[in-house]
Regions:
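Nucleotide/pyrophosphate-binding catalytic subdomain
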Residues: 1-170
Length: 171
């Protein structure tokens, strides 16, 4: 199998005049294997504000406390991921939305305590990607990971990961 091209898109791609999704569909139709990793920081921030959950950033990355982590997982793993998958499928592509948790795709550990539940990628298990790609599907990945390595019992089973980092690690 040919190594897939990994494309990182922002959540802002939806509803804009950006042609990225149409371009992705065109590439998939040519038989070139692709993996899409998406972000969605602005959408997450909007939802956090709606829930009156304060958010702060250090060096451009979200500090993720437990309340924010729940919202990040819901918004990125649910809303943003499914909107991107629906848009790609509406354009004639064949996309499947997953998160880094699914199939133990991304395993990580907490980067440092000041960032809260934000992690560093430790391992990428591409088995689920290989399965989807060999069946002709375009995996669309939200940057949430399994927090399985060195996880203290009192911490959540998932972590927020920067989408650019996830894309780089998968590539």
């Amino acid at each position: 199998m040919i190594k897939p091209t990994v494309i990182k898109i922002g959540g802002a791609t939806l509803g804009s005049h950006d042609t990225a999704l149409a371009d992705i569909v065109e590439i998939q139709k040519r038989g070139i294997p692709l993996v899409v990793v998406h972000g969605g920081a602005k959408v997450v921030t909007r939802w956090l504000e709606r829930q009156s959950i304060s958010t702060r950033f250090i060096d451009g990355e979200r500090v993720t406390d437990e309340s924010a982590l729940e919202m990040v997982a819901a918004v990125l793993g649910g809303l943003v991921n499914k909107e991107i998958v629906a848009a790609i499928n509406d354009l004639g592509g064949e996309a499947v939305g997953i998160s880094g948790i699914d199939g133990a795709l991304i395993q990580s550990r907490i980067r440092n305590r000041k960032m809260g539940y934000t992690g560093n990628v430790v391992r990428v298990n591409t088995g689920i990607l290989d399965t989807l790609l060999s069946s002709g599907y375009l995996p669309v990945i939200s940057p949430i990971s399994s927090h399985t390595l060195d996880r203290p019992e009192d911490t959540p089973p998932m972590l927020n990961i920067n989408g650019d980092t996830v894309a780089g690690e998968i590539a």
